[in-house]
Amino acid sequence: NPARILRNTINAEDAIFDGNGVDYTDYEPLKAIKETNYSNPELARQYMEAAVAELCEADGTIKGIEACTVDYLPVGTFEVDGKLPVTVIYVGTDDESEIIMAQLMKAMVEEAIGTDLINFEIAAFSGWTYGTVADPLNYDIYFDSLSTGYADPSGLLTRMTTDGAENVGCYEVPEYDALIEKSLNAATFEERLQYFAEAEAYLCNGAYVIPFISSLRGYYMTNSMPFTSPLTLYGNSKYKGTLVMEEPLTYDEYKTLEAAYDIARTEALKEI
């Protein structure tokens, strides 16, 4: 089911649990974000219209903006007239799959908001380095892929502070920084997760970061028997104890293994 790769949170569901078996993404206010359906074209248009009413003159001139040439070289230069529609530059590689993803995003944004208010332009780089675009901040939308080596929210969230390595938006978030500091100094693991959940929700609610996908691999095949590997596949022991299947697993067999795992997990948590 492709829906399984959609995600609203920075840290993945079913990857981090507290001592009582509670999923980190079930800590509020992160839980509400995880369970929200953000696909709402009508609301997107309403927000854009509200922004236009506040930031534009009656003739569509954007307040504080003048006609000029925007230098995004080596991506290109763009002439702007300081009026609606707002131009958004999406910069990506010339990889076929990435171009398709950019085209899909362009279609979704323009269909939801309307080309009368937004102009989504795609620029693909080839023959020049990533650093010539990313380092001088020559982008409006930055697509990034994050991974972590251990089952703790700090693996991702400490890299997204005001001075963090993954702060590609160059934002200043002292409130977020303070929550991260509280997380790292928490007295218990549960308290640590609570502060991290509040920090992660802060980034998501403020749209500093917009998570939307958990993996680009889609469907995949494996010889590993489900529920015999460690729950989170990190480190050099991630396959310790894993059973290897010689024959394909049917759906009914998978559901049987899943039911047995759920029972065993519930019983194990009672002993904690």
Question: What are these regions, as identified by a protein language model?
Answer:
Residues 1-107, 111, 198, 251-272:
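Append "and occasionally in soluble cytosolic enzymes with long acidic Gly/Pro-rich linkers
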Residues 1-3, 31-37, 41-44, 115-130, ...:
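Extracytoplasmic/peripheral linker and loop segments enriched in polar/acidic and small residues
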Residues 87-90, 121-122, 140-144, 210-211:
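Structural recognition of the beta-strand scaffold that forms the well-ordered cores
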Residues 97-100, 130-133, 150-155, 221-223:
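Extracytoplasmic/secreted cell-surface and envelope-processing proteins
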Residues 103-111, 127-140:
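Short helices/loops that flank or line small-molecule/ion binding pockets
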Residues 139-155, 171, 215:
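Ligand-binding clamshell of periplasmic/extracellular solute-binding protein-like
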Residues 221-272:
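Long beta-strand-rich cores associated with HINT superfamily self-processing modules
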